[in-house]
Protein backbone atom coordinates (compact mmCIF):
# COMPACT_ATOMS: atom_id res chain seq x y z
CA UNK A 1 0.00 0.00 0.00
CA UNK A 2 3.09 2.17 -0.27
CA UNK A 3 3.68 3.00 -3.90
CA UNK A 4 6.94 1.46 -5.20
CA UNK A 5 7.45 -0.41 -1.89
CA UNK A 6 9.18 -3.26 -3.73
CA UNK A 7 11.79 -0.80 -5.07
CA UNK A 8 12.64 0.99 -1.80
CA UNK A 9 15.83 0.02 0.05
CA UNK A 10 16.81 0.73 3.65
CA UNK A 11 19.46 3.09 2.30
CA UNK A 12 16.76 5.05 0.45
CA UNK A 13 14.79 5.36 3.70
CA UNK A 14 17.86 6.63 5.57
CA UNK A 15 18.75 9.04 2.77
CA UNK A 16 15.20 10.34 2.27
CA UNK A 17 15.19 9.12 -1.31
CA UNK A 18 12.26 6.70 -0.93
CA UNK A 19 9.55 9.01 -2.24
CA UNK A 20 7.26 7.97 0.62
CA UNK A 21 5.06 10.89 1.72
CA UNK A 22 5.72 12.32 5.18
CA UNK A 23 2.89 11.84 7.65
CA UNK A 24 3.56 15.35 8.98
CA UNK A 25 2.50 16.75 5.59
CA UNK A 26 -0.92 15.08 5.72
CA UNK A 27 -3.68 17.66 6.22
CA UNK A 28 -4.84 17.87 9.84
CA UNK A 29 -1.95 15.72 11.16
CA UNK A 30 -1.10 18.36 13.77
CA UNK A 31 -4.73 18.99 14.70
CA UNK A 32 -5.59 15.31 15.16
CA UNK A 33 -2.34 13.51 15.95
CA UNK A 34 -2.47 9.71 15.76
CA UNK A 35 -2.15 7.60 18.91
CA UNK A 36 0.40 5.04 17.75
CA UNK A 37 2.72 4.14 14.89
CA UNK A 38 0.08 2.03 13.10
CA UNK A 39 -2.31 4.99 13.02
CA UNK A 40 0.53 7.24 11.91
CA UNK A 41 1.57 4.93 9.08
CA UNK A 42 -2.03 4.53 7.95
CA UNK A 43 -2.10 8.25 7.17
CA UNK A 44 0.23 7.75 4.19
CA UNK A 45 -0.93 4.36 2.95
CA UNK A 46 -2.40 4.52 -0.55
CA UNK A 47 -1.07 8.06 -1.11
CA UNK A 48 0.92 8.61 -4.30
CA UNK A 49 4.69 8.67 -3.97
CA UNK A 50 6.44 12.02 -4.05
CA UNK A 51 8.67 10.58 -6.80
CA UNK A 52 10.06 7.26 -8.01
CA UNK A 53 12.48 5.84 -5.39
CA UNK A 54 16.10 6.90 -5.70
CA UNK A 55 15.48 9.77 -8.10
CA UNK A 56 15.09 12.74 -5.74
CA UNK A 57 15.43 13.90 -2.13
CA UNK A 58 12.43 14.67 0.10
CA UNK A 59 12.58 14.73 3.90
CA UNK A 60 10.01 12.25 5.17
CA UNK A 61 9.28 11.55 8.82
CA UNK A 62 7.58 8.36 7.63
CA UNK A 63 11.00 7.02 6.66
CA UNK A 64 12.15 7.26 10.27
CA UNK A 65 8.91 5.70 11.51
CA UNK A 66 9.46 2.71 9.22
CA UNK A 67 13.15 2.40 10.15
CA UNK A 68 12.30 2.57 13.85
CA UNK A 69 9.62 -0.11 13.55
CA UNK A 70 11.93 -2.33 11.48
CA UNK A 71 14.67 -2.04 14.11
CA UNK A 72 12.24 -3.01 16.86
CA UNK A 73 10.97 -6.03 14.90
CA UNK A 74 14.34 -7.31 13.69
CA UNK A 75 16.26 -6.82 16.93
CA UNK A 76 13.44 -7.87 19.21
CA UNK A 77 13.98 -4.93 21.54
CA UNK A 78 13.40 -1.19 21.50
CA UNK A 79 15.20 1.15 19.13
CA UNK A 80 15.76 3.30 22.23
CA UNK A 81 18.32 0.77 23.42
CA UNK A 82 20.12 0.89 20.07
CA UNK A 83 20.28 4.69 20.13
CA UNK A 84 21.58 4.68 23.71
CA UNK A 85 24.22 2.02 23.08
CA UNK A 86 25.40 3.14 19.64
CA UNK A 87 25.12 6.93 19.89
CA UNK A 88 24.32 8.45 23.29
CA UNK A 89 26.78 6.47 25.42
CA UNK A 90 29.81 6.61 23.07
CA UNK A 91 29.36 10.38 22.64
CA UNK A 92 28.69 10.90 26.37
CA UNK A 93 25.41 12.62 25.65
CA UNK A 94 24.38 12.50 29.28
CA UNK A 95 21.62 15.08 28.96
CA UNK A 96 19.71 13.36 26.16
CA UNK A 97 16.72 11.27 27.12
CA UNK A 98 14.53 8.77 25.31
CA UNK A 99 11.54 9.03 27.61
CA UNK A 100 9.59 11.55 29.67
CA UNK A 101 10.02 9.08 32.53
CA UNK A 102 13.77 9.78 32.56
CA UNK A 103 13.44 13.51 33.25
CA UNK A 104 11.68 15.93 35.54
CA UNK A 105 9.03 17.31 33.18
CA UNK A 106 9.10 20.68 34.94
CA UNK A 107 12.70 21.03 33.76
CA UNK A 108 11.80 20.63 30.07
CA UNK A 109 10.86 23.61 27.98
CA UNK A 110 7.29 23.61 26.73
CA UNK A 111 6.60 24.42 23.12
CA UNK A 112 4.42 27.27 21.97
CA UNK A 113 2.93 27.84 18.54
CA UNK A 114 0.28 30.42 17.75
CA UNK A 115 -3.00 28.67 16.98
CA UNK A 116 -1.87 25.31 18.34
CA UNK A 117 -2.37 24.67 22.03
CA UNK A 118 -1.21 21.10 22.72
CA UNK A 119 2.37 20.58 23.80
CA UNK A 120 3.78 17.73 21.71
CA UNK A 121 5.92 16.12 24.38
CA UNK A 122 4.71 12.54 24.29
CA UNK A 123 5.91 9.24 25.67
CA UNK A 124 7.63 6.91 23.23
CA UNK A 125 8.21 8.94 20.08
CA UNK A 126 10.19 11.87 21.41
CA UNK A 127 13.78 12.52 22.46
CA UNK A 128 14.83 15.34 24.75
CA UNK A 129 18.31 16.88 24.72
CA UNK A 130 20.10 19.84 26.22
CA UNK A 131 21.42 22.45 23.80
CA UNK A 132 24.94 21.32 24.67
CA UNK A 133 24.18 17.69 23.78
CA UNK A 134 22.59 18.76 20.49
CA UNK A 135 25.78 20.70 19.69
CA UNK A 136 27.98 17.72 20.58
CA UNK A 137 25.87 15.42 18.41
CA UNK A 138 25.94 17.75 15.40
CA UNK A 139 29.72 18.09 15.74
CA UNK A 140 30.12 14.28 15.88
CA UNK A 141 27.81 13.89 12.90
CA UNK A 142 29.71 16.40 10.82
CA UNK A 143 33.22 15.26 11.78
CA UNK A 144 32.26 11.60 11.32
CA UNK A 145 33.05 10.41 14.84
CA UNK A 146 29.48 9.16 15.36
CA UNK A 147 30.02 6.57 12.61
CA UNK A 148 31.79 3.24 13.09
CA UNK A 149 32.96 2.91 9.51
CA UNK A 150 33.57 4.85 6.32
CA UNK A 151 30.63 2.99 4.81
CA UNK A 152 28.29 4.44 7.44
CA UNK A 153 29.78 7.92 7.04
CA UNK A 154 29.35 7.72 3.27
CA UNK A 155 25.59 7.26 3.62
CA UNK A 156 25.41 10.54 5.51
CA UNK A 157 27.87 12.44 3.31
CA UNK A 158 26.08 11.42 0.12
CA UNK A 159 22.75 12.91 1.06
CA UNK A 160 22.94 15.52 3.71
CA UNK A 161 20.94 18.56 2.69
CA UNK A 162 20.79 21.47 5.11
CA UNK A 163 17.11 22.19 4.81
CA UNK A 164 15.21 20.64 7.67
CA UNK A 165 15.19 22.57 10.94
CA UNK A 166 13.23 20.12 13.04
CA UNK A 167 10.11 22.26 12.94
CA UNK A 168 6.93 21.09 14.60
CA UNK A 169 4.35 23.22 16.39
CA UNK A 170 6.04 24.85 19.34
CA UNK A 171 9.54 23.57 18.62
CA UNK A 172 12.35 24.19 16.20
CA UNK A 173 15.79 22.67 16.64
CA UNK A 174 17.79 25.10 14.51
Where do the model's predicted regions map?
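Short, surface-exposed loop or secondary-structure junction motifs
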Residues: 2-174
Amino acid sequence: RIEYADQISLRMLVQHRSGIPSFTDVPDFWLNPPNNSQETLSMVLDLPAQFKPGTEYYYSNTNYLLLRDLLDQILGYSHHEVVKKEILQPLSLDHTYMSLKEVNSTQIMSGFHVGYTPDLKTEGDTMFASAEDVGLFIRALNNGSVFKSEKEAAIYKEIYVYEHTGLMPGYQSI
